[in-house]
Amino acid sequence: TPTRPVLLPDAPALIAGVRGVVWLSADGEVDTLAGQEVARRLQSAQPPIICHGRSFFARLGVKPFAVFDVLELYAFVRPAEFTLPTPRGLAEVLGLALPTSHEQEAESLMAAAHALISELATMPRDRDSGAIAWAMQRGGWRWAEPVLAALGAGEQPHSGSAAAGLAVWDRLSEWNDRGPETPPRDLPVEPVEARAQLVKLLGSGAENRPGQADYAGAVAPAFDARNKRGEPNVVLADAGTGVGKTMGYIAPASVWAEKNEGAVWISTFTRNLQRQLDAELDRLYPDPVEKIDKVVIRKGRENYFCLLNFAEATGRLRSGAGAPGEAIGLGLMARWALKSRDGDMIGGDFPSWLADLVGRGTTLDLTDKRGECTYSACLHYSRCFIERTIRRARGARIVVANHALVMIQAAMGGEEGQLPTRYVFDEGHHIFGAADSAFSADLTGFEAEDLRRWLLGAEAGRHSRSRGLAVRMEDLIAGDDEAMAALDEALRAARVLPGPAWRQRVAGGEAVGPTEEFLSFVRQQVYARETGGAATYSLEAGTESPVPGLLEAAGALEAALIRLRKP
């Protein structure tokens, strides 16, 4: 029973269908309306309750307007918990009756809002939740009033106190450095052990699949100790659809990991398989607390929530440099960060639909996509999600990673000079393509822009931690005229790379410098010859018969890059 007020907006619930909009008034009346009638009614009504604003507005064919989006409320009340971003998906996770018509979907949205506010009203008092909600209220969050009432958050705090509610880094625990791990032993996995483990993992009610048991026994020799330097034991195993390959190799891998007190790294190509493995490993470690210690999903840094990026975003908000509405997205991110298992925003427990609702700037763009990590120099290093995951992996039994990360680590000798001794490569047919991707370089506008920023540092009006080569080198070469002259030459050469607003200039035919000139001609050729029609997310064209000027621009860019590369 709720212990605090459960307030709901006196607003209609709207569902946009193919044939019109279902309008469920707050007092229960249902109408199906055309677009013009909806617009007329909205002029005198409360902002409506809807689900997934972006798709709702797209279906109506209108510009966004003020709404109560139930998904935003769900992201606040149940951060890091999965739901499909639909009325039916919400009903399913909240234990409500599943809707089978648009009218029932509208009813379901109202019921979902009531259930979520009621859930808040029964939670133990939580200072963090109230502080975050107050910060979001200052940004104009529609749900703020019922949420604050349900939380019993009291009077509005000073603006500084409200902004401090977003300082999640102060509430995250610090990770502890583990001591050096004892090298794993080399006890073998007998085929009979692999088969027995498979039976245990599948349980007594599982379908009898002899091929799966044969597979588990056949791959067990891959875990034997090597007999010659540089000659690991390799089992190349293939099996048809339906055999159950995943559990077939998890069984011997888990036996080896426990017997030898070491980690087996399972390398995949796709995120879907990583998610599948994460779910399958619940069989091995049904206790969630034990699983956190024993299973780690490793990814590149660009996949994880960066606390420093988040702190800088909240700092811009406090200083007035950010738009007030950004507080809504940042507040929902704060809620998620406090509940997330590992801070993984790409395929982890981050709800991907949240970026559709509040924008990439306060969600996905908070990852470290630009390689600007300052590592131990960062104020939040001891609470960093990435560093925490790296340390957890050192003591784990099963580590799931992707081919690219595994190969890069192998090429660089591993973290602290230590490499895993046992690997399973699933989706092995992608290894060569993954290697090409991991060890190749892209000649793109974004890559060139990053290189310019690394060399010159942040330029006028740009939010970046890049200090530039001059700042990094000045203490080392102070007083050395020859070195200073070489530095000046390098910085002049770097200006051939695309600067701020290069995309607008390239698209507008106002390219500046050899890189932008080259990209402009490439863009011209792609747009002139692509055949994908409306498929604007994947434009491509052949390299044959280059458009006039492209080869000359390529030659000029090559000369400029050679000059930049010279010591």
Question: What are the functions of these language-model segments?
Answer:
Residues 72-73, 102-185:
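N-terminal accessory nucleic-acid engagement/regulatory domains that precede
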Residues 220-224, 246-260, 281-284:
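Walker A/P-loop NTP-binding motif
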Residues 184-237:
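Conserved pre-motif I regulatory segment
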Residues 380-390, 401-419:
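Conserved RecA-like ASCE ATPase "motif II neighborhood" in helicase/translocase motors
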Residues 418-439:
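SF2 helicase catalytic motif II
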Residues 9-120:
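Conserved DEDDh/DEDDy metal-dependent 3′-5′ exonuclease domain
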Residues 184-198, 262-263, 268-397, 456, ...:
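A substrate-engagement module of RecA-like helicase motors
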Residues 237-249:
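Glycine-rich P-loop/Walker A and Walker A-like loops and their local beta1-loop-alpha1 context
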